[in-house]
Design a protein with these regions (language model features):
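Bacterial Sec-exported substrate-binding components of ABC uptake systems
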Residues: 1-82, 189-218
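Residues at the C-termini of beta-strands that transition into short coil/loop
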Residues: 26, 98-101, 119, 163, ...
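A short, structured surface patch at a secondary-structure boundary
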Residues: 31-61, 67-130, 136-143
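Extracytoplasmic substrate-binding proteins
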Residues: 66-69, 73, 136, 145-226, ...
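Short, solvent-exposed loop/turn and secondary-structure capping segments
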Residues: 85-89, 148-151, 230-233
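Short, structured coil segments at secondary-structure junctions
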Residues: 90, 155-156, 243-244
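Alpha-helical, coiled-coil/dimerization segments enriched in small aliphatic residues
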Residues: 228-250
Length: 250
């Protein structure tokens, strides 16, 4: 069996994202998806997913989650991952979601009877989750590891952290669709889909830069006594600037 050190071939090093990388080993079909700083304040933290293919085993010293083969039944804890699977032409792989009534994806909206709503991070319906027989749960952490982790380990359901919302550029966020494609066993398709996105984005950015007026933009609505706004370093602020707007915080 291969050792962890054998997985030192970078199969995909993102051009825009700083949150993940995909590694392989000589002569092996299996890959390792590494996620860097997967939640706020997680600098130096790293999570790993071993995607076992061709009957290969994870190295004995592998510290992360193990997915047995390409994921065909996926539970998405954020609607972002649904959009990425849709962009890959594979929305039917979504078997479970969080908060189905708030999801606008056409496939999910038209298949509510077949897709299970598993609840939210702090209030999960694990019986429903188990009944979906998922290959993997795509989840996220906000200010720490997901509260779902211990129970998913107990149930033997693999999970992977998606840190796309922490990216500082819209293209960095979009590039996570390659990570989702790797999990689904279709990285080449993911690279192909993503390749077009920066070209379209940059042409629109150039067009927006010619606008004479830059509207001032605020985000969200008040919640309780607070008005939560994305920081100026976030992908949202970058998106507003690139679209020809002026973020109220900058």
């Amino acid at each position: 069996a291969a050792s962890l050190g054998d997985f030192d071939i970078s199969l995909y090093a993102p051009a825009y994202s700083s949150g993940f990388e995909i590694f392989g080993a000589e002569g092996m079909k299996s890959t390792i998806l590494k996620t860097y700083a997967p939640w706020q304040g997680a600098e130096g933290e790293e999570t790993q997913l071993f995607i076992a293919r061709n009957g290969e085993q994870a190295p004995a010293d592998f510290p992360g989650q193990v997915l047995d083969g390409d994921a065909r039944r996926i539970v998405c804890m954020s609607s972002t991952y649904i959009a990425m699977l849709d962009a890959l032409g594979e929305p039917q792989r979504v078997v479970g979601v969080s908060g189905i009534d708030y999801i606008s994806n056409p496939y999910v909206a038209s298949h509510k009877e077949q897709i299970g709503d598993v609840g939210y991070d702090g209030n999960m319906n694990y019986e429903r989750l188990l009944s979906l027989s998922p290959d993997i749960v795509l989840l996220f952490g906000v200010s720490g590891a997901s509260a779902m982790e211990p129970k998913l380990r107990e149930l033997g359901i693999p999970y992977a952290y998606m840190g796309e919302y922490l990216e500082q550029s819209p293209l960095g966020k979009a590039e996570w669709l390659v990570a989702v494609a790797e999990i689904a066993g279709m990285r080449e398709r993911g690279e192909e889909v993503f390749r077009e996105i920066p070209l379209r984005y940059d042409s629109l950015k150039t067009l927006a830069a010619k606008a004479e007026r830059k509207p001032v933009v605020m985000l969200n609505t008040p919640y309780g006594d607070s008005w939560l706004m994305a920081p100026p370093s976030s992908y949202v602020a970058r998106l507003i600037a690139d679209a020809g707007g002026q973020y109220v915080y900058t």
